[in-house]
Amino acid sequence: MKTRFTAPLFGAAIALLSVAVTTQTATAATATKIIFPKGSYCASYSGNFSKSKTYSLYLLKNQDFEVKAANMEDGIHIRDARGVLRGQWIDDNTYRIHTRTKGLHYVTVRSPYGDQQVEFCAY
């Protein structure tokens, strides 16, 4: 017995796929690449974070990546190379992810307090 996709289900699957690709492409287009100074594991960025800012970084499997910033109140989100939100708060100012896959990771930072300094560290 053959199984067939019905047109509505197939159309819905295509629509979901196109939304996912569009969202990831939009994120990639607006992301600022994190660049570490030579010989350093950390890079700092400062500015007004009252609107979300997205950063990108290529990480290898089994790396620890930390984002440090004061008063973020859950304003840090990290998407792994597969687009899955990962990470946890390890103290009041530090959000950490242990990478499961290699690839481009995206960090979104937003603060209700506006001006901030954010530090990114990869080990």
Language-model features and meaning:
Residues 55, 112-123:
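Edge beta-strands of jelly-roll/beta-sandwich modules across compartments, strongly enriched
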Residues 2-13:
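Bacterial N-terminal signal peptides that target proteins for export
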